[in-house]
C-alpha cells in the first residue's frame, strides 16, 4: 500500500494525462508540472496503475484512436495526428501493441476477441 500522498500524486498525474492525450509528455515534464521527482512520479504511478505514465498515456491514446476508427470515416493518418503521431508506421505499431491488431484491421471489424477491450481507468 502506498502513502495517501503518493496515491493522490498518481491520480493527479493520471487526470492530467487524460486531459492531454494529444500531447507528447515526458516524465520530466510531469515532474516539473507536479513539483515531484521523476522517480517519485514513476514509482507512485506504477504502484497505483500497474504501468508507467508513458504506457498509460499510450493506452489512452490508442483506445481513443480505436473509438474514432470505428465511429468516423477519418483516415488513419488523420487520427494518428490527433494523438500526436506524425508517422503512420509508428502509430500502427503502437496501436497493434496496445489493441492487438492493426488500425485497418480494427476498423474493418475483424473478430477481436484478443483485443484490449478498454483503456485503464483513472
What are these regions (language model features)?
Residues 29-36:
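Long, charge-rich low-complexity segments
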Residues 11-19, 24-29, 47-86, 108-122:
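Terminal helix-turn-helix DNA-binding modules in bacterial transcription factors
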Residues 40-41, 45, 90-91, 95:
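Short hydrophobic/aromatic patch on the recognition helix
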Residues 37-38, 86-87:
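Short coil turns linking two alpha-helices in DNA-binding domains
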Amino acid at each position: 500500500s502506498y502513502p495517501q500522498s503518493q496515491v493522490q500524486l498518481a491520480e493527479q498525474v493520471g487526470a492530467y494525462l487524460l486531459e492531454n492525450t494529444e500531447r507528447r509528455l515526458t516524465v520530466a515534464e510531469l515532474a516539473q508540472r507536479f513539483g515531484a521527482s521523476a522517480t517519485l512520479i514513476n514509482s507512485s504511478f506504477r504502484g497505483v496503475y500497474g504501468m508507467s505514465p508513458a504506457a498509460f498515456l499510450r493506452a489512452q491514446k490508442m483506445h481513443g484512436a480505436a473509438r474514432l476508427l470505428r465511429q468516423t470515416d477519418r483516415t488513419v493518418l488523420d487520427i494518428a495526428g490527433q494523438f500526436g503521431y506524425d508517422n503512420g508506421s509508428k502509430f500502427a505499431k503502437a496501436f497493434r501493441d496496445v489493441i492487438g491488431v492493426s488500425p485497418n484491421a480494427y476498423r474493418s471489424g475483424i473478430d477481436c476477441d484478443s483485443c484490449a477491450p478498454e483503456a485503464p481507468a483513472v
